[in-house]
Design a protein with these regions (language model features):
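Catalytic domains of carbohydrate-active enzymes, especially glycoside hydrolases
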Residues: 1-10
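Conserved, mostly hydrophobic/aromatic
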Residues: 2, 57, 112, 150-152, ...
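Alpha-helical scaffolding within the catalytic cores
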Residues: 9-13, 37-47, 94-107, 133-137, ...
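Substrate-binding cleft of extracellular glycoside hydrolase catalytic domains
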Residues: 12-91
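Aromatic-lined carbohydrate-recognition surfaces of secreted/lumenal glycan-active proteins
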Residues: 29, 81-100, 146-153, 188-200
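Aromatic- and acid-rich polysaccharide-binding/catalytic face
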Residues: 55, 61, 94-132, 155-156
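Active-site clefts of carbohydrate-active enzymes
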Residues: 117-120, 144-172, 195-203
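Aromatic-rich peripheral "rim/lid" segments of glycoside hydrolase catalytic domains that contact
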Residues: 161-168, 182-224
């Protein structure tokens, strides 16, 4: 599996290429404050799904967390997508705790997609895997029996500390290993964030935002 975060600006090609290599894609429809752009994204996501190139259609990512749209607006996009592609699982991505607060979103989604970041909750690295597992259990408790997928989790290898959460290569690789050992044992599906470092993200998250990848921005594996 791979995951995308948009269906425009060339991102609509990624699921096609992934399919050629035998990979499924969780196709992300980017939603925000620009309603006209949302319509373009949704139409492109639906087209990708109808072409058989979406294993899951994820309509929106952390939209409530950012405060870009209301719950009712997000539900409208989700329901329109479900009507357009009835054979494809349709869902919405956000922080795990928001599914506790918005049960109508749980009802509208075919699967529950949760982002789990102990780092951004100032959790010390040694306790982070256990805290991530607790996030998952909390989402499971309100999922009404639906499949819960961790759509994002990770730990940065460099940058400034966030409270008691300290970046570093050792902390990052330990988090990765413990996360995947647990996921394999418990049969939990995870999209790890992320494949590559992204230098452009420093504007939003400070210097730590650039260093969440397993590979650096030049494609070199960081943990060898």
């Amino acid at each position: 599996w791979i995951r995308t975060f948009s269906c425009t600006d060339g991102n609509e090609r990624s699921p096609v290429v992934a399919r050629e290599f035998g990979l499924d894609t969780m196709v992300g429809v980017c939603l925000g404050e620009d309603h006209a752009m949302n319509e373009i994204e949704l139409a492109s996501g639906i087209a990708i799904a109808r072409a058989g190139n979406a294993g899951i259609l994820a309509v929106g990512n952390e939209v409530l967390l950012r405060g870009d749209l209301s719950e009712d607006e997000i539900l409208d996009y989700i329901l329109r997508a479900r009507e357009a592609v009835p054979g494809v699982p349709v869902a919405y991505v956000d922080a795990y705790f928001l599914f506790e607060q918005y049960p109508r979103l749980v009802e509208a989604c075919d699967v529950i997609l949760i982002n789990c970041y102990p780092f951004w909750e100032s959790c010390p690295a040694e306790y982070a895997p256990a805290y991530m597992r607790e996030m998952y259990r909390r989402a499971q408790a309100v999922a009404n029996g639906k499949r819960v997928i961790i759509s994002e989790t990770g730990w940065p290898s460099r940058g400034e500390a966030y409270g008691e959460a300290v970046p570093g290569k050792e902390n990052a690789i330990n988090y990765f290993i413990e996360t995947y050992l647990w996921a394999q044992k418990e049969d939990v599906d995870i999209f790890y964030f992320s494949s590559f470092d992204e230098s452009w993200k420093t504007g939003d998250e400070g210097d730590v935002g650039a260093y969440w990848g397993l590979w650096d921005e030049h494609g070199k594996m960081k943990y060898v």
